[in-house]
C-alpha cells in the first residue's frame, strides 16, 4: 500500500507542470517603418520579461493561462499597454507599433559620459545633429556637412589641394578629437584628407561635445570631440539610393542595402562614390579653383544576435581617393616634376572596428579598432609619402551602486607612423626611424546623484605615453536643475597633446616655405572649463523652444604656433614663451513649431590670443564672431519642404608673405548660404534641388589675387639678396614668392544641384 501511495505521489509530481496550461506571446516591434531593438517587453506585475532582438522580434515563453497587461518600454517612444487573456492552445502573436517622441529621440546622447542618456539629463552638454539635419544641405562628406553647425568651422588650408580641418570654438583642427562609434579611429594623418572620406550615408547622427572630455576619451580631446554614430542595422532601410549632381559637374552617389544571414546575423552595406573631374578656373589665375577628386568609400556593418540580447557588432570601411589641384593643364605625367605645377594626392585607408559585450552578469563592454592610412603625395617637386597604423582596444565596466553610477575602463593604443621626411629619420646617419607610440591607460568616472536636482561627476585618467611618460587628466562636472526647470552645467578638465607638424600643418609640406624648428618641442598642456545654461519651453499645439548658452575658457602652456610673419620664406615652430587663451560665448536657439517649421539659430563670440613677452597677438585665421542657421518649413498641401541654411563670419587676420604683399590683411565679413526644395509626395521617394552658395561669395573678391606668384610656382624667376630675401624686380613688383596658403573660405562659387533619394523598408 505504501508503495502504491508513493507511486501516485511521484506521478502527480512529475505531471504537475503539464497540468498548468501555458502559451507563448510573441511578435514584432516597429515604429511603423523600422524594427526596434532592445525594447523592454513585460507582463505588468509578473516575472515575465524579455527584450526585442536586432530585427524587432520578442517572445515571452511559457506564460500560464490568465489575464495580463502586456507593456513595452524604451526611451524615446510612447509606452504600449494592452490587456490580454490567454486561454487557448495557440501561441499569441501581438505586433506592436510604437510612436516615437520626436524631441526625446533627437536628444538621446552617448558621447558625454559613454552612457546613453537623454540630452537634458546628461551632465555634459552634448549637441546632436541627425541625418535629417545633414540632408537639409546635401553634401558628400563630413567636412562639408558641418558648415552650418554653430561654433564649428571647416577650415580650408590650401587653395590648391583643398585640405582642411574642423575647428571647434576657434581652436585648430588637431585639438578636435574625431571618433567613429566612440573610438579614436580618425588618426592624425587621416585628418589631412580623410575627413572628406567619411560619407554622410553611413552617419546616423553626429554628437558634438565642446570642451573637456579627456578623462574618458584621452588627453588629446582638448577643444572638444565629434563622435560619428554610424547607422544601426535594425533602423536602416532594406535598400536606399541617394544621388545628386551639381552644375559644376560634381556627382555624388550613395547606395546601401541590408540583408540577413540566417536568423542571427544582420548585414548593412553602403557604398559612396564622389566624382569631380572638371578643371574650373573662374578667377583666371591659371590654377584650378577647387581640387579634382575621385573617391570611393565602402562601409559594412555586421550585427550578431546573441543570448540575452548581449551586444556584438563588427564594421569595416575602405576608402580610396585620388585628388589633384594646380595649373589647369597639369596631367599625371607631370607629377613631381618642375615644368607644370600640381599637387597630387593618392590616399588609401582601411578601418575595422567593433563592440562586444562580455557574457557576464556585470555590464562589461570590449571595443576595438584597427586602421591603416597611406598617403602618397606630391606638392610640386616636394614628395610626402606617409603611412600610419593605429590599433586600439578598450574594456569598460558599467556599474551602479546606490546613488553612484561608475564607469571604469582600461584602454590601450599603439600608433606607428612613418614618412619620407626628416621627422622619422635618425639625427645622425639619416637612417629610417618610424615613430612608435605605445599608450596604455586606465580611467575611473563616477556620476553621483546628490538629490533629484543635483548631480556631480568626477573622473580621472592615467595614461603612460612611451615617449612623454606619465599623463594624468582629471575631470569634474556639476549639474543642477533650477525651480524653473532650467539646467546649469559646469565642466572642467585638463589636456595634453604631442604635436606632429607634418600631419597637422599642411603648409609644412608644400615646399613654398622652409620649415624651421627652433627647439625640441614640448607637449602642449591645457586647462579648460565650460559653463552651460539650458532652458526648454513647451507651448500649446506641440510647440517647443530650447535655449542654450555657454561660456568657455581654455588656457594653454607650451602652445605651439606656426610663425608665418617673422620671415615670409619660413615657417618657424617653437613653444611660445608665454601662454595661449581661447575664450568666448556661444548661444543656440532651437524652435520646433507643430512639426511643420524648424528653426535653429546659433552665434559664437571668440577671443583667441597668445601672450608672449608681454605682447598679445590674435590667432590668425580665427574669426571673432560667427553665426549659423537652419530654417525648414513644410507645405503639407503640396508635399514640399523648403530648407534655408547658412553661416556668417567676421573678419580674420590672414597670413601675408611680405610687407609689399597687396592682398588684404583681413578677410571681409563673409557668408555662404544655401536653399533647397524637397518634394516628398511619392511614397519612398524624395526629389530635391536647390542652390549652394546662393549669393556667389568668393574669397578672391576685392583682392588682386589669391595665390601669390601663380605665374611662377617653382620660383624660377625670383631674385634674392645676400640674406635670402626676395627683392623687387619688374617681374615681381611685390617681392613675393609662390604661396597658396592665403585662404579662409572655399573658392567655389554659386552652383545648382538636383538629386533623387529612395528608401525601401
Which role fits each region the language model picked out?
Residues 648-655, 679-761:
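C-terminal beta-signal and adjacent terminal beta-strands/loops
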Amino acid at each position: 500500500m505504501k508503495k502504491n501511495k508513493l507511486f501516485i505521489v511521484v506521478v502527480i509530481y512529475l505531471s504537475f507542470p503539464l497540468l498548468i496550461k501555458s502559451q507563448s506571446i510573441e511578435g514584432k516591434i516597429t515604429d511603423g517603418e523600422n524594427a526596434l531593438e532592445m525594447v523592454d517587453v513585460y507582463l505588468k506585475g509578473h516575472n515575465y520579461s524579455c527584450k526585442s532582438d536586432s530585427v524587432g522580434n520578442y517572445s515571452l515563453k511559457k506564460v500560464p493561462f490568465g489575464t495580463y497587461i502586456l507593456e513595452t518600454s524604451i526611451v524615446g517612444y510612447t509606452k504600449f499597454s494592452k490587456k490580454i487573456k490567454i486561454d487557448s492552445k495557440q501561441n499569441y502573436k501581438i505586433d506592436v507599433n510604437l510612436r516615437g517622441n520626436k524631441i526625446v529621440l533627437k536628444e538621446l546622447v552617448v558621447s558625454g559620459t559613454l552612457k546613453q542618456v537623454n540630452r537634458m539629463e546628461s551632465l555634459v552638454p552634448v549637441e546632436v545633429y541627425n541625418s535629417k539635419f545633414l540632408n537639409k544641405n546635401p553634401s558628400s562628406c563630413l567636412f562639408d556637412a558641418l558648415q552650418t553647425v554653430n561654433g564649428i568651422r571647416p577650415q580650408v588650408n590650401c587653395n590648391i589641394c583643398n585640405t582642411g580641418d574642423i575647428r571647434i570654438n576657434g581652436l585648430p583642427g588637431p585639438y578636435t578629437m574625431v571618433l567613429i562609434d566612440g573610438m579614436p579611429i580618425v588618426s592624425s594623418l587621416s585628418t589631412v584628407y580623410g575627413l572628406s572620406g567619411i560619407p554622410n550615408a553611413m552617419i546616423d547622427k553626429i554628437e558634438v561635445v565642446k570642451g573637456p572630455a579627456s578623462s574618458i576619451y584621452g588627453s588629446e580631446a582638448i577643444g572638444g570631440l565629434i563622435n560619428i554614430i554610424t547607422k544601426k542595422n535594425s533602423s536602416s532601410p532594406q535598400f536606399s539610393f541617394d544621388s545628386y549632381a551639381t552644375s559644376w559637374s560634381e556627382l555624388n552617389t550613395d547606395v546601401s542595402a541590408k540583408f540577413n544571414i540566417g536568423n542571427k546575423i544582420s548585414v548593412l552595406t553602403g557604398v559612396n562614390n564622389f566624382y569631380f573631374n572638371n578643371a574650373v578656373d573662374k578667377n583666371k589665375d591659371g590654377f584650378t579653383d577647387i581640387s579634382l577628386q575621385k573617391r570611393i568609400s565602402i562601409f559594412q556593418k555586421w550585427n550578431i544576435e546573441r543570448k540575452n540580447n548581449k551586444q556584438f557588432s563588427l564594421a569595416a570601411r575602405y576608402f580610396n581617393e585620388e585628388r589633384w589641384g594646380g595649373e589647369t593643364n597639369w596631367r599625371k605625367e607631370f607629377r613631381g616634376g618642375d615644368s607644370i605645377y600640381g599637387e597630387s594626392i593618392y590616399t588609401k585607408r582601411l578601418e575595422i572596428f567593433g563592440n562586444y559585450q562580455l557574457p557576464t552578469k556585470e555590464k562589461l563592454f570590449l571595443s576595438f579598432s584597427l586602421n591603416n592610412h597611406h598617403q602618397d603625395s606630391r606638392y610640386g617637386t616636394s614628395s610626402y609619402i606617409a603611412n600610419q597604423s593605429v590599433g586600439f582596444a578598450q574594456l569598460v565596466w558599467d556599474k551602479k551602486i546606490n546613488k553612484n553610477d561608475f564607469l571604469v575602463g582600461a584602454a590601450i593604443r599603439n600608433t606607428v607612423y612613418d614618412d619620407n621626411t626628416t621627422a622619422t629619420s635618425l639625427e645622425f646617419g639619416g637612417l629610417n626611424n618610424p615613430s612608435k607610440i605605445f599608450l596604455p591607460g586606465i580611467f575611473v568616472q563616477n556620476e553621483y546623484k546628490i538629490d533629484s536636482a543635483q548631480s556631480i561627476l568626477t573622473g580621472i585618467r592615467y595614461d603612460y605615453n612611451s615617449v612623454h611618460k606619465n599623463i594624468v587628466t582629471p575631470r569634474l562636472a556639476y549639474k543642477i536643475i533650477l525651480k524653473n526647470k532650467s539646467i546649469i552645467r559646469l565642466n572642467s578638465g585638463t589636456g595634453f597633446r604631442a604635436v606632429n607638424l607634418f600631419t597637422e600643418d599642411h603648409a609644412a609640406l608644400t615646399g613654398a616655405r622652409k620649415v624651421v624648428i627652433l627647439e625640441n618641442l614640448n607637449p602642449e598642456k591645457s586647462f579648460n572649463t565650460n559653463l552651460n545654461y539650458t532652458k526648454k519651453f513647451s507651448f500649446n499645439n506641440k510647440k517647443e523652444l530650447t535655449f542654450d548658452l555657454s561660456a568657455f575658457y581654455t588656457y594653454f602652456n607650451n602652445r605651439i604656433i606656426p610663425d608665418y610673419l617673422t620671415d615670409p620664406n619660413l615657417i618657424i615652430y617653437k613653444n611660445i614663451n608665454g601662454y595661449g587663451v581661447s575664450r568666448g560665448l556661444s548661444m543656440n536657439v532651437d524652435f520646433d513649431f507643430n512639426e511643420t517649421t524648424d528653426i535653429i539659430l546659433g552665434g559664437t563670440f571668440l577671443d583667441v590670443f597668445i601672450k608672449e613677452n608681454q605682447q598679445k597677438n590674435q590667432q590668425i585665421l580665427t574669426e571673432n564672431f560667427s553665426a549659423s542657421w537652419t530654417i525648414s518649413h513644410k507645405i503639407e498641401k503640396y508635399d514640399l519642404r523648403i530648407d534655408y541654411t547658412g553661416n556668417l563670419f567676421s573678419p580674420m587676420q590672414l597670413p601675408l608673405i611680405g610687407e609689399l604683399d597687396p592682398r588684404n590683411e583681413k578677410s571681409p565679413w563673409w557668408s555662404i548660404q544655401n536653399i533647397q526644395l524637397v518634394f516628398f509626395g511619392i511614397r519612398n521617394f524624395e526629389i530635391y534641388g536647390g542652390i549652394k552658395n546662393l549669393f556667389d561669395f568668393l574669397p578672391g573678391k576685392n583682392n588682386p589675387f589669391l595665390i601669390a606668384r601663380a605665374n611662377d610656382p617653382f620660383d624660377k624667376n625670383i631674385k634674392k639678396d645676400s640674406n635670402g630675401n626676395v627683392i623687387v624686380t619688374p617681374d615681381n613688383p611685390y617681392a613675393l614668392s609662390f604661396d597658396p596658403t592665403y585662404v579662409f573660405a572655399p573658392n567655389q562659387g554659386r552652383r545648382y544641384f538636383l538629386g533623387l533619394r529612395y528608401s525601401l523598408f
